[in-house]
């Protein structure tokens, strides 16, 4: 990788890495030690409890464990522990992805597993994050795209603590590693850029707006950017190959209305953050359908979509 970075720099190409800041593998040494006891170096790097917080968590865990591939299930927030420590640990998405403990913005005193953001465990995790960034900056990396950057601090509805966390990282990064770029998978530039990021990305799952433009599962259609010489929109299948339920199809909204809704949303995001950074248009990612899905797969259709992407302030092309 260092050799790749060097050769890229020789050609004037910058290199960014993807940073998954919210979880580790359940095979990671930090987690394996944390799973042994509550008084070890990495014990509070993760969130453990001897009970589930409520009936919903119990129901979710029961449903998840019934699945034959439950380790790949995104149901619920807790996983049953098979380790010497407490009965349950908090997962980020899948059970094999235990959530790192960045703390709770508003910890509930009745939930002893909820630590404040300035308690020793969360503070140590923040330092580890800085150490990881410093390591790769030292190898010549020019910046990072941060996975689910808004999700690190728990119970943070007004985003106060996650903004504080990333502002701290930004200040530290600028002081020690100037001229580096931070890009977030956030999907809300008014928060993201205020947190110190240079770039936020328009996501396919944010307020349903991106789907209006690219591919609209709710409307069982190809999105407002699809045009049909015969009028209307062809039906396509959703991300998983299954038809969207008929009772969720909103046939009253026209492609033109969908396009205007997206345009109004996107331009508001751009105009309100113009002096803060960039709100990027993307052609796809690992969670996002490529723009040539379904009927939008001809040169004529793709020219329309790519005209939008390439005209906006910062296009991101997914290869």
Name each model-derived stretch.
Residues 1-118, 124, 138, 149-200:
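Acidic/aromatic-lined carbohydrate-recognition and catalytic surfaces
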Residues 140-142, 282:
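Short loop/turn motifs at secondary-structure junctions
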């Amino acid at each position: 990788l260092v050799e790749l970075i060097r050769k890229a720099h020789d050609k004037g190409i910058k290199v960014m890495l993807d940073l998954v800041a919210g979880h580790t593998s359940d095979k990671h040494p930090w987690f394996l030690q944390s799973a042994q006891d509550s008084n070890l170096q990495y014990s509070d790097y993760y969130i453990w409890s001897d009970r589930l917080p409520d009936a919903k968590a119990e129901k979710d865990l029961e449903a998840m464990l019934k699945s034959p591939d439950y380790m790949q299930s995104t149901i619920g927030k807790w996983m049953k522990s098979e380790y010497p420590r407490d009965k349950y640990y908090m997962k980020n998405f899948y059970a094999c992805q235990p959530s790192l403990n960045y703390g709770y913005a508003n910890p509930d005193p009745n939930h002893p597993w909820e630590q404040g953001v300035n308690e020793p465990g969360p503070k140590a995790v923040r330092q580890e994050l800085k150490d990881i960034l410093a390591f790769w900056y030292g190898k010549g990396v020019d910046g990072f795209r941060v996975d689910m950057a808004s999700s690190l601090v728990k119970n943070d509805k007004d985003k106060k603590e996650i903004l504080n966390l990333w502002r701290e990282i930004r200040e530290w990064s600028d002081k020690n590693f100037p001229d580096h770029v931070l890009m977030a998978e956030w999907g809300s530039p008014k928060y993201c850029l205020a947190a110190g990021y240079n770039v936020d990305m328009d996501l396919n799952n944010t307020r349903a707006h991106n789907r209006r433009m690219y591919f609209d599962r709710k409307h069982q259609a190809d999105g407002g950017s699809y045009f049909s010489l015969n009028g209307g929109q062809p039906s396509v299948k959703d991300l998983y190959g299954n038809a969207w339920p008929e009772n969720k199809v909103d046939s009253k909204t026209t492609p033109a209305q969908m396009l205007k809704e997206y345009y109004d949303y996107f331009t508001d995001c751009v105009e309100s953050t113009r002096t803060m950074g960039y709100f990027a248009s993307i052609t796809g990612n690992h969670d996002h359908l490529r723009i040539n899905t379904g009927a939008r797969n001809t040169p004529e259709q793709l020219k329309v979509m790519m005209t939008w992407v390439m005209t906006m302030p910062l296009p991101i092309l997914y290869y």
